Amino acid sequence: YTRSDTLSLHDALPIYIIMQHSALVVIDLQNDITKNYKEIIEKVNTAIDWAVKKNLWVIYIQHNNLSAGTRTFKPGTRGAELVPEMNVVSEHIFTKTKSNALTSEAFTAFLQEHGITAFYIAGADAAACIKSTCYNMAKKGYTVHVLSDCITSYDKKKLPEMLAYYESKGCAVVELHEVTQC
């Protein structure tokens, strides 16, 4: 038998409350991101479905590049839009202009308003925005789970190094199947 076979509704209530304070955060899966996202999009969509089923908040982070000299992630362009293959199941879409998602005042206000303190992270780029966001979340004392098979990078060779980095900063690195079986 499994642990869930022995849970009563009373026993499950604390789990439900914990999940209300948790969020799946999908970072920068936008048209201008590395095409490597196509290798993870199915798992990201599975993670989104799992989050909805488990009553987690589903949050999307978009990067807007305001630098004059660059052409990617420009506000109002197709490149800045979320990738069309991704399931968008909420209106909780926040924009950032720096690599750390916590620099978005609207995002941090939303987290505070809803008491969100635990995160499951998916998206890109593992060596940039995910790295900065995870570091800063862990530094603030949040619980951070990086879904290792739901992240990618422009340079996929850096993924093992990034996973070790996340762990060294106090983040849990897990595969999607490890959390969806709970």
Describe each model-derived feature in a short phrase:
Residues Y37, I41:
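Flexible, glycine- and charge-enriched loops at secondary-structure boundaries
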Residues T34, A68, D155:
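Conserved protein kinase catalytic core
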Residues A51-S67:
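Von Willebrand factor
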Residues Y16-A23, E42, T46-K54, R71-C182:
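Active-site-adjacent betaalpha module
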Residues Q30-N36:
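Short acidic, Gly/Ser-rich segments with clustered Asp/Glu that frequently serve as metal-coordination loops
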Residues V25-I27, I59-Q62, F94-T95:
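Short, conserved beta-strand edge motifs with alternating hydrophobic and charged residues
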Residues Y1-L13:
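Short, small-residue-biased leader/transition segments that mark boundaries at the very start
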Residues L29, H63-N65, D149:
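Active-site loop/turn elements of alpha/beta-hydrolase fold enzymes
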